[in-house]
Amino acid sequence: MNREFVEAMQHLALERGVSVEEILEAFKEALRKAYIKRQKGYKKEEIDQGKGPEVDVYIDPNSGRIEMVEVRRVVEKVEDPDKEIALAEALQYDPEVQVGDEMEFPINPEELSRMAIQDLRQILTQRLKESERNRIYNEYKDKEGQVLTGVVTRVDNRGNVFVELGRGEAYLPRSEQIPTEKYHPGQRIKVYLKKVDKSAKGPSLLVSRAHEKLLEHLLKQEVPEIAEGIVEIKAIAREPGRRSKVAVTSHNPNVDPIGACIGHKGQRIQAVSAELGREKVDIILWSKDPKEFIRNALSPAQVGSIELDPEAKKARVKVTKDQHSLAIGTGGQNVRLASKLTGYDIHFEEAEISDLDEALRRAAEEEAEARERKAREEFEKLFRDLG
């Protein structure tokens, strides 16, 4: 090897956008594998498993001179002829050698270089992929769980979408997409970074448009009261692209959490809906009373009495015939979302209108009692703070 070799390595490094050191390391690996494969007869899979002799390669980055040696450990009895040499044989090379020493046997690199160059491109490509995967992992690991803005680069024939996120390409599989949306190259979209995977052979950044956290982020972005902690999101249930229910509460008695989320003339909630493919977003008042929370979650339907089985997390709800279909919703959507939001498996029983009137009266009384209890707790807290 000579200076021309060094210049060729420099040119290849420039072409691939990597350092000369990385090119030289890749070439060393190619030389090692060429020797073990061509001279020792090992297959690629065996070499990758660490089989074969130990080979050290030295390359002078200035002159391009290459030195190669096969390293063997001196032992009394040889068990691995590729990595060991018997003491009796070793003494023929060095009369002062001892058991446990390592001996180096020179290898002529010239005849291997041509073979190694054939493998260099493949090894270099593999190393570059590993290097790129490590870079993406280190850059994006701390961003896992965040919402990022990216640009769609391509859509494959199975409908999976690839999104450019600055210096990394993310993978948006069909299972994480909003079903009602169509994606096209050049389109800017917001995505939730669900997982950063270093070991993946394919794309290592998994993103989602269907995740509840994306909706939560958009609400924080549009509703200052949420961003400031005045209004708190307690639970979210989504059927992406179609409908969502969001349970909220206010830590300030002067702030209406539902009104804050909806905004003047519905502007805030409409902006969120537009970002999610016109997904309908219902804002629900959260309550620590499970019955009241379930009643609110089933809105816009009006329901009667509610019986709970807290251990089984089941709720039996009475509803009149004219409210039954509204409580269930199209294709069962309303009750599915309410169940997911509250954590209760909700079942309905039809009730007479008179029964419903009585149930609504009791519900109103319970709600009034709950408001009075809450006001009393806030007054007592204020009194303690002043004291």
UniProtKB/Swiss-Prot annotation:
GO biological process: DNA-templated transcription termination; transcription antitermination
Signal peptide: none
InterPro entries: KH_dom, KH_dom-like_a/b, KH_dom_NusA-like, KH_sf_prok-type, NA-bd_OB-fold, NusA_bac, NusA_N_sf, S1_domain
KH domain boundaries: 312-379
Gene Ontology CC annotation, any one: cytosol
Major location (coarse): cytoplasm
UniProt keywords, alphabetically: Cytoplasm, RNA-binding, Transcription, Transcription antitermination, Transcription regulation, Transcription termination
Presence of the UniProt keyword DNA-binding in the record: no
Location of the protein in the cell: Cytoplasm
One Gene Ontology molecular-function label: DNA-binding transcription factor activity
Gene3D superfamilies according to UniProt: 3.30.300.20, Nucleic acid-binding proteins (2.40.50.140), NusA, N-terminal domain (3.30.1480.10)
S1 motif domain: residues covered: 145-209
Record-linked Pfam families: KH_5, NusA_N, S1
NCBIfam families the record matches: NusA
Assigned protein family: Belongs to the NusA family.
Subunit architecture: Monomer. Binds directly to the core enzyme of the DNA-dependent RNA polymerase and to nascent RNA.
Function: Participates in both transcription termination and antitermination.
Name of the featured protein: Transcription termination/antitermination protein NusA
Species assigned in the record: Thermus thermophilus (strain ATCC 27634 / DSM 579 / HB8)
